From Swiss-Prot:
Record Pfam families: Actin (PF00022)
Family: Belongs to the actin family.
One CC-aspect GO term: actin cytoskeleton
Enzyme class: hydrolase
InterPro entries found in the cross-reference section: Actin (IPR004000), Actin/actin-like_CS (IPR020902), Actin_CS (IPR004001), ATPase_NBD (IPR043129)
Main subcellular location of this protein, as a coarse class: cytoplasm
Gene Ontology molecular function terms on file: ATP binding; hydrolase activity
Organism for this UniProt entry: Nicotiana tabacum (Common tobacco)
Cell location: Cytoplasm, Cytoskeleton
UniProt keyword list: ATP-binding, Cytoplasm, Cytoskeleton, Hydrolase, Nucleotide-binding
EC nos: 3.6.4.-
Protein name: Actin-66
General remark: There are at least 7 different actin genes in tobacco.
Catalysed reactions, semicolon-separated: ATP + H2O = ADP + phosphate + H(+)
Amino acid sequence: AGFAGDDAPRAVFPSIVGRPRHTGVMVGMGQKDAYIGDEAQSKRGILTLKYPIEHGIVSNWDDMEKIWHHTFYNELRVAPEEHPWLLTEAPLNPKANREKMTQIMFETFNVPAMYVAIQAVLSLYASGRTTGIVLDSGDGVSHTVPIYEGYALPHAILRLDLAGRDLTDCLMKILTERGYSFTTSAEREIVRDVKEKLAYVALDYEQELETAKSSSSVEKSYELPDGQVITIGSERFRCPEVLFQPSLVGMEAAGIHETTYNSIMKCDVDIRKDLYGNIVLSGGTTMFPGIADRMSKEITALAPSSMKIKVVAPPERKYSVWIGGSILASLSTFQQ
């Protein structure tokens, strides 16, 4: 969250609501019944953590309202009724979801005006393009969204319920097989950190597995909060490989490369060339080292041989949706 015209968000925190697992015994400690974002993260050892947004769609409106309240009053420290707001939503978001969002903004927070933008379109704005296909992969959901001259092509948008949280789960499973136990919602956050710090995408998965078997070059160690050190090897690339091979976790879905290709093939034959040449990655789950090269390799294999393929991975892609929103909301034409 932040202000239009800024080049980076003022507040970045996870959409988590944490509730105490135990009853408070110290009088006057001012214990709350719910903690939001970073505070929930830091006190996670005694909390049950819940995500009100599942697969990119809000599933718990009371918690979502708490998160918005926290954003306005504690993070940005502005009165919501004094500013117009730009909110974002996942592509193919149910209409009822958008209506509920609008209702809460107007009735609970009394905002003077608001606009709901599609996340992937904003990412494309942030990359300085008006035509391209965006692969947006966050925590709960991935989408491929073809956009031509600023218009999203709804018939060709594809959704894949495979994203950051599934990769964290997958890594939790692999680590459990290795004898490390991560069970609570709080411990899952530790695994997420391991994933963000150490995981990468292999250019050639089979070859990388061979390398990992024969040498210790891929091994890295990670210190857990209690001081115990774990070593992870092939897990580093086995976990993000799920993006390209969902069958590894028993999902009957096409990988992100195939989904991108299928999305392009659903578009008019005349615009495919422009889409192949502007494949833009966005969202936290596209932050793995090596993902752009692998994506380029996989799509080149699927596309016609003469086709020029370009995968763009902007360094700020973790926040490119926000940056695109900042650009859009600061346009005078938009404000009218």
